[in-house]
């Protein structure tokens, strides 16, 4: 490019000069007329050449050249000559390289395109390494002096040339390369066509002759491509689809757009009468068959007679050929563009290539002749292709898709569907069958024949089914096809169609999630297509026998019974109107999904549950569970084009495979009357197991309170690949709230409920203002239900469900009762057993017993596990490992709790509910006695991690134990990658592996969330707490070995100190927000905040009054001792659950129960020996392992359980480590909140054992890390934060610099220079804490902390100082009481002046009564010096501090 540009400049200037030189020879007018004439060229050719060159140069350069020319015109001849001689020659300078690098010119693209076309060809058996291809292209460009395209641009051109090519990574581990699969170098290379440089031909003939010669030389591909372009353009201009240039020409002639008397027009018309009809009927895509090439040339063809005739001949020939052979796979795109299948049938397959490939389905597409003649070539289903005109006609689409039994078809097969053109009004129906290709792993296997009949237009479909098999959902949704492209309006013909789709695991969705149901392409915007479908499901004799039993065979995808839903047109009661607003169209095609089906789904959720009988009572209004959430065929569809309906499939319905994207559900579709309320509400006693591996606690979907069925629509935003379809996985859980009420009642009350999806928030609008507006309880339940960790949703999206009172209108939020539901595609389902017991559920519906049953949420479908993991196996592991682990429940519950916390981006954008849309909101259930403390963190750091740090944590007092704020439970495991920004779901265990992303989850863990990860997981990430599962015999906590422990303390203590310092020092929120802090964790920090909430049964914790985190933790510790006795491996080494875990201390003698502390992740409290909370003193904490554990607990957010393992550690050892003083955090939350939140996390334990002591849920591998990481948004950085900081809390205080030995080998010193002693270890830490802390301190003007840090660092550097001055006598290590009595000098460096560290910030804090109280109560609230005011407090710790 640069060269061309310069050459042009030179050329033009040179030509200028030459023109002047020629002036003598030429007539005086010549130079003026052709200033840029090149000698030897005729005027026309010179102009042509100049014009060509000019077009290849960007505008800016053209303007520059013009300016230069203006200057040059003023020169004398000599000056011009001089300029000409001075023009630089040779390769152009790099001056313009920057401009070129920014954007590739069309010339470069053309070169690349031609090189690719001439060098490579498709070959299914071979692959070419991408780098080699690019290198070859680059060398080609270098040889010719072209500027090569950037690798990214080149890749785009490759995709254009070979749309079917896929990228693959081939090679052995560590040596794999990315390859273009399906390509090879051409075996036979054609001589490249060279541009015609012969400009000496006579100018007169230039027009006609040149075009014809160009056409003759142009290769057929180019011609067909040009035809396609012309047709495409004509379609836009004329709003009429044209299959070929012939059609266009004929149309132009018939419509009198052009003269009909010309030779060309006559020829066209003669050809038309001669038998072109057959041609037109050839596939709609015929010209498109070669669609892959793009060439803008030949635009003028239509106007050229010769061109037209030639094209006619060629096209006719081609069309006839193509009649014989169905279009090649590559042609799909073309088809799409051209006209989409005339019947629209092919369109099923035809959306975009992406759509095509993903779901293989054996489909027989029968185009049923629609009663109304459809105009020929009118695509009934308009694919998103540009063709669709804006007309909003709805064509009746009568398509019967019959899936062949057990045929698995590769995704590409759809491409092979011959288009059945309806042709000119003679609807010729072909019944091409897509032949199944060999099943591939992708291939969808349809267990039982699925028949999807799509009928369009208000259709009342009745599917009487005497028995309900496993639900076969017939999705009766009218698909309004807006064949926008054709101007002709077609009457809507309603066809009744019923489809019983075998749902492989998810009813209608075929395993791949491609629902047989055709996705009606979203009508084009501007096409008002609203077809209402009234579907009545009349459970005909749905006998309980026929209870929908979703058997989930280990291969959940494989066995699914088929339930036929009988739909009767009952009145509007069930009618689902799916309206597609144009706007909505994109979001959702017909949304009317039988939400009732969803309701049943709620029941059905369990369906995937093994062997769970969802008995639909025989006569219940039996809206049997219509799982009418057909998956849209195109999982990939990037836009929510597909009918929301199809998308709506119950999340559970969704294929289990986490990979699949649930089709987006119509977000706006009102939920059809709740009639779908689970017909056979499961009797309360009837367990509707979550469908999750948790067999143990199937939750009964019994409706607990309200008649109203609550539909929880939980959209989970799943971004998979590029498609960010908000797959709203709505699991509409219709929970019949009145257990005894008949479903009808439920239906009646909920019928009018509209679920509106605004932004990410669903608003439930009770239109009917039914007698029972959904009670908040019901809503809470819904929220619980709604919280489906949809494994499919990779991106956890918080969806705030707003309960809008019907009367108040959608905008009225009845209450923030809704916990915003966080959907993390959490595999939690597997874990989550409904914690019926768990207080969380209670929390969720405190007053309302209502749904412990959110259980359904854990639907196998949500399992991120692939089918090979069976629920059974998972269940067994889970049950065996920790059936009681509340953890399982926690994740779900937190969802119930609306633990939106995790979601940073609350889906609540559109909804009034989220007060802080930016931050996940945690709404405590209104009923919970605990007052939720909603502290939005200033801003959840938007990190790739799915779980935004929940900014608000609910800190609950003792009640929190019972109700545990969801936060505690929330520690939901986030997808493993979340910290990395990948929301990809990993096997249930993995996402929650407690290891920070840096620590590879143990192989076991992947399968078993509770599995133990190797204790040796990386030490550097203390956050990576590997021991996620109960201790296994082989993994005795290293801490149990006294000598080893001591050594490790000595060796590692400092290394962990830095992180601990981070954790012990709350990382300032600004830091917390830093990616560096967050990223190390694979899991969102939200869990951490939970950790920080240690559950305190203690009364003082129960009160919301600020509780010193230390005391808090002490109580936690006490609780921990209470906690389940089964031994939990103490997080060894740096593995403490605290993500800052580097400072985790091993407790040698701590009982397993103590170790069980859940890695702090759950409790974040080291269950240290029970230490009287009051006894805990900051110094005591430093000194006593118990205290340290307390600190750890306090820091659970920071996940720096410094003391965690330290209980058994001798005081001397502990004393040797300096506890970095906590840095002041500008947390908005009160410490109390933080602590409470931590307590709540403890509550997970409660869930587990139903006792506060049950930390197991936290303890589970996933929980450990996830809680630590996820618990507190503050902690989200996985930065170790002060325990207090862990939850973002308003309180600020400096933690005393504790002398504790942290496992991490680093010293606590924050100053970058000062950790030198242990500086080497720092490298392991997630952050170089010294610099980070320093920045934090500076940034937050925490000079005091900084000073403290410096002092601490200096002290740490001089470890000897600590050992001599601060070391406690080993005698003291025995009990905290002793510690309380210790001489303060032992704990603190006597040399240090109490006032030294105090700073303006401290003074501010001192002025804050709450802060003071907190400081008083929390050991770590103050540095030894620094809070003199605390001396007035009666705590011995305070005294010691003083």
Swiss-Prot record:
It is found in: Nucleus. Residues 1-36, 406-426, 485-514, 929-1001 are annotated as: Disordered. The keyword Nucleus applies. Disruption phenotype: Morpholino-mediated knockdown in embryos results in a defect of ciliogenesis in the neural tube and failure of neural tube closure. At stage 18 (late neurula), neural folds fail to close. At stage 23 (early tailbud), lack of acetylated alpha-tubulin and ARL13B positive cilia. Reduced expression of TTC25 in cilia axonemes. Residues 935-947 have a biased composition (Pro residues). The lineage of its organism: Eukaryota, Metazoa, Chordata, Craniata, Vertebrata. This is DNA-binding protein RFX7. Coiled coil: none annotated. GO terms for biological process: positive regulation of transcription by RNA polymerase II; regulation of transcription by RNA polymerase II. It comes from the Eukaryota. Belongs to the RFX family. Pfam families: RFX5_N, RFX_DNA_binding. Transcription factor. Acts as a transcriptional activator by binding to promoter regions of target genes. Plays a role in natural killer (NK) cell maintenance and immunity. Plays a role in the process of ciliogenesis in the neural tube and neural tube closure by regulating the expression of RFX4. InterPro entries: DNA-bd_RFX, RFX-like, WH-like_DNA-bd_sf, WH_DNA-bd_sf. SUPFAM superfamilies: Winged helix' DNA-binding domain. A motif (PxLPxI/L motif) lies at residues 192-197. Residues 957-995 have a biased composition (Polar residues). One of its GO terms (cellular component) is nucleus. Keywords: DNA-binding, Nucleus. GO terms for molecular function: DNA-binding transcription factor activity, RNA polymerase II-specific; RNA polymerase II cis-regulatory region sequence-specific DNA binding; RNA polymerase II core promoter sequence-specific DNA binding. Residues 112-187 bind DNA.
């Amino acid at each position: 490019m640069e060269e061309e540009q310069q050459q042009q400049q030179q050329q033009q200037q040179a030509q200028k000069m030459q023109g002047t030189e020629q002036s003598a020879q030429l007539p005086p007018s010549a130079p003026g007329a052709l200033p840029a004439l090149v000698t030897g060229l005729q005027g026309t050719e010179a102009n042509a050449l100049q014009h060509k060159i000019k077009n290849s140069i960007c505008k800016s350069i053209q303007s520059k050249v013009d300016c230069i020319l203006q200057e040059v015109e003023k020169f004398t001849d000599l000056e011009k000559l001089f300029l000409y001689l001075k023009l630089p020659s040779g390769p152009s300078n790099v001056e313009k390289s920057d401009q070129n690098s920014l954007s590739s010119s069309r010339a470069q693209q053309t070169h690349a395109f031609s090189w690719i076309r001439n060098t490579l060809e498709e070959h299914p058996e071979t692959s070419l390494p991408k780098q080699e291809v690019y290198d070859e292209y680059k060398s080609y460009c270098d040889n010719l002096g072209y500027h090569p395209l950037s690798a990214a641009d080149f890749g785009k051109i490759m995709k254009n040339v070979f749309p079917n090519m896929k990228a693959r990574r081939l090679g052995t581990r560590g040596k794999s390369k990315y390859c273009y699969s399906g390509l090879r170098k051409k075996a036979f290379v054609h001589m490249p066509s060279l541009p015609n440089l012969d400009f000496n031909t006579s100018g007169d003939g230039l027009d006609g002759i040149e075009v014809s010669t160009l056409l003759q030389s142009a290769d057929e591909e180019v011609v067909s491509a040009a035809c396609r372009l012309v047709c495409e353009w004509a379609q836009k201009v004329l709003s009429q689809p044209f299959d070929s240039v012939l059609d266009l020409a004929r149309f132009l002639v018939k419509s009198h757009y052009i003269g009909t008397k010309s030779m060309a027009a006559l020829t066209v018309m003669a050809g038309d009468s001669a038998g072109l009809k057959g041609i037109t009927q050839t596939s709609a895509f015929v010209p498109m068959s070669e669609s892959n090439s793009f060439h803008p040339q030949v635009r003028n063809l239509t106007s050229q007679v010769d061109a037209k005739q030639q094209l006619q001949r060629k096209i006719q020939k081609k069309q006839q050929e193509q009649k014989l052979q169905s279009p090649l796979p590559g042609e799909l795109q073309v088809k799409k563009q051209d006209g989409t299948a005339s019947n629209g049938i092919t369109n099923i397959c035809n959306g975009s290539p992406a759509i095509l490939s993903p779901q293989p389905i054996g489909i027989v597409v029968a185009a049923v002749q629609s009663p109304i003649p459809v105009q020929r070539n009118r695509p009934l289903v308009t694919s998103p292709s540009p063709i669709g005109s804006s007309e909003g006609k709805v064509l009746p689409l009568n398509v019967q898709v019959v899936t062949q039994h057990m045929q698995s078809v590769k995704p590409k097969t759809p491409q092979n569907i011959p288009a059945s053109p309806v042709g000119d009004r003679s609807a010729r129906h072909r019944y091409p069958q897509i032949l199944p290709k060999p099943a591939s792993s992708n291939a969808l296997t349809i267990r039982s024949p699925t028949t999807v009949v799509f009928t369009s237009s208000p259709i009342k479909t009745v599917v009487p089914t005497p028995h309900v098999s496993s639900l076969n959902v017939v999705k009766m949704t009218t698909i309004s096809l807006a064949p926008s492209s054709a101007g002709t309006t077609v009457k809507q013909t309603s066809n009744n169609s019923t489809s019983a789709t075998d749902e492989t695991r998810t009813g209608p969705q075929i395993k791949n999630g491609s629902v047989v149901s055709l996705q009606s392409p979203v009508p084009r915007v501007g096409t008002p297509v609203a077809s209402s479908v009234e579907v009545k499901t009349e459970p005909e004799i749905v006998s309980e026998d026929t209870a929908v039993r979703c058997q989930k065979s280990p291969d959940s995808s494989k066995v699914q019974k088929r339930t036929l839903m009988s739909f009767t047109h009952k009145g509007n009661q069930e009618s689902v109107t799916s309206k597609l607003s144009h706007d909505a169209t994109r979001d959702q095609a017909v949304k009317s999904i039988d939400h009732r089906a969803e309701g049943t789904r709620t029941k059905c959720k369990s369906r995937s549950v093994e062997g769970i009988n969802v008995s639909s009572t025989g006569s219940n209004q039996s809206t049997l569970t219509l799982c009418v959430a057909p998956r849209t065929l195109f999982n990939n569809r990037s836009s929510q084009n597909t009918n929301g309906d199809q998308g709506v499939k119950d999340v559970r319905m969704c294929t289990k495979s986490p990979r699949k994207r649930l089709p987006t559900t119509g977000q706006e579709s009102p939920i059809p009357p709740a009639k779908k309320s689970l017909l056979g509400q499961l009797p309360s006693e009837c367990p509707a197991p979550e469908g999750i591996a948790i067999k143990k606690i199937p939750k009964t979907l019994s409706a607990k309170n309200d008649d109203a069925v609550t539909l929880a629509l939980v959209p989970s935003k799943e971004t998979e690949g590029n498609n960010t379809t908000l797959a709203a996985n709505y699991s509409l859980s219709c929970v019949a709230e009145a257990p005894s009420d008949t479903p009808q009642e439920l239906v009646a009350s909920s019928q009018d409920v509209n679920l509106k999806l605004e932004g990410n928030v669903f608003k439930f609008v009770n239109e009917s203002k039914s007698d029972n507006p959904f009670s908040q309880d019901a809503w809470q339940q819904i929220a619980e239900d709604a919280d489906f960790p949809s494994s499919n949703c990779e991106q956890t999206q918080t969806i705030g469900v707003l309960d809008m009172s019907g009367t108040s209108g959608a905008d009225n939020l009845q209450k923030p009762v809704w916990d915003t539901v966080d959907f993390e595609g959490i595999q939690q389902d597997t874990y989550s057993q409904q914690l019926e017991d768990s207080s969380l559920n209670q929390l969720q519906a405190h007053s309302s017993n209502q749904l412990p049953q959110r259980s359904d949420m854990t639907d196998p479908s949500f399992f991120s596990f692939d089918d090979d993991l069976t629920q059974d196996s998972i269940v067994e592991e889970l049950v065996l490992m920790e059936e009681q682990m509340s953890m399982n429940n926690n994740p779900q519950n937190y969802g119930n709790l609306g633990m939106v916390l995790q979601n940073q981006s609350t889906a609540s954008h559109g909804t009034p509910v989220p007060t802080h849309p930016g931050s996940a909101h945690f709404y405590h259930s209104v009923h919970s006695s605990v007052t939720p403390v909603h502290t939005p963190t200033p801003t959840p750091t938007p990190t790739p991690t799915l779980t935004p740090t929940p900014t608000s944590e609910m800190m609950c007092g003792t009640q929190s134990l019972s109700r545990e704020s969801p936060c505690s439970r929330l520690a939901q495991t986030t997808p493993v990658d979340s910290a990395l920004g990948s929301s990809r779901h990993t096997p249930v265990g993995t996402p929650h592996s407690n290891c920070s992303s840096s620590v590879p989850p143990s192989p076991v863990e992947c399968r078993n969330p509770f599995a133990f990860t190797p204790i040796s997981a990386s030490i550097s990430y203390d956050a990576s707490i590997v021991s996620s599962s109960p201790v296994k015999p082989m993994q005795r906590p290293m801490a149990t070995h006294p000598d080893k422990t001591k050594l490790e303390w000595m060796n590692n203590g400092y290394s962990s100190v830095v992180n601990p310092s981070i954790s012990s020092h709350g990382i300032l929120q600004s830091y917390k927000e830093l990616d560096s802090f967050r990223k190390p964790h694979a899991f969102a920090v939200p869990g951490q905040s939970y950790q920080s909430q240690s559950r305190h049964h203690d009364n003082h914790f129960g009160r919301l009054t600020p509780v010193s985190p230390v005391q808090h933790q002490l109580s936690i510790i006490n609780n921990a001792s209470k906690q389940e006795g089964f031994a939990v491996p103490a997080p060894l080494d740096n593995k403490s659950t605290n993500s800052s875990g580097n400072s985790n201390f091993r407790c040698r003698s701590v009982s397993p129960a103590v170790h069980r502390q859940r890695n702090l992740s759950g409790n974040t409290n080291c269950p240290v020996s029970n230490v009287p909370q009051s006894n805990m003193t900051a110094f005591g904490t430093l000194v006593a392992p118990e205290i340290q554990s307390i600190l750890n607990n306090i820091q659970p957010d920071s996940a720096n359980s410094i003391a965690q393992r330290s209980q058994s550690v001798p005081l001397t050892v502990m004393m040797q480590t300096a506890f970095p003083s906590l840095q002041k955090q500008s947390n908005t939350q009160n410490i109390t909140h933080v602590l409470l939140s931590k307590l709540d996390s403890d509550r997970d334990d409660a869930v587990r054992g139903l006792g506060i002591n049950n930390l197991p849920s936290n303890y589970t591998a996933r929980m450990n890390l996830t809680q630590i990481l996820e618990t507190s948004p503050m902690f989200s950085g996985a930065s170790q934060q002060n325990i207090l900081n862990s939850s973002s809390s308003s309180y600020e205080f400096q933690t005393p610099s504790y002398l504790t030995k942290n496992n991490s080998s680093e010293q606590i010193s924050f100053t970058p220079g000062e950790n030198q002693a242990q500086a080497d270890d720092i490298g392991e830490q997630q952050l170089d804490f010294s610099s980070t802390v320093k920045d934090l301190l500076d940034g937050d003007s925490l000079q005091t902390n900084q000073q403290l840090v410096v002092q601490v660092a200096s002290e740490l550097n001089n470890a000897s100082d600590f050992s001599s001055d601060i070391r406690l006598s080993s005698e003291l290590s025995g009990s905290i009481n002793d510690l309380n009595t210790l001489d303060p000098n032992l704990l603190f460096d006597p040399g240090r002046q109490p006032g030294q560290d105090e700073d303006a910030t401290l003074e501010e804090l001192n002025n804050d009564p709450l802060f003071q109280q907190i400081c008083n109560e929390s050991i770590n609230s103050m540095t030894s010096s620094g809070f003199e005011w605390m001396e007035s407090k009666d705590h011995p710790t305070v005294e010691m501090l003083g």
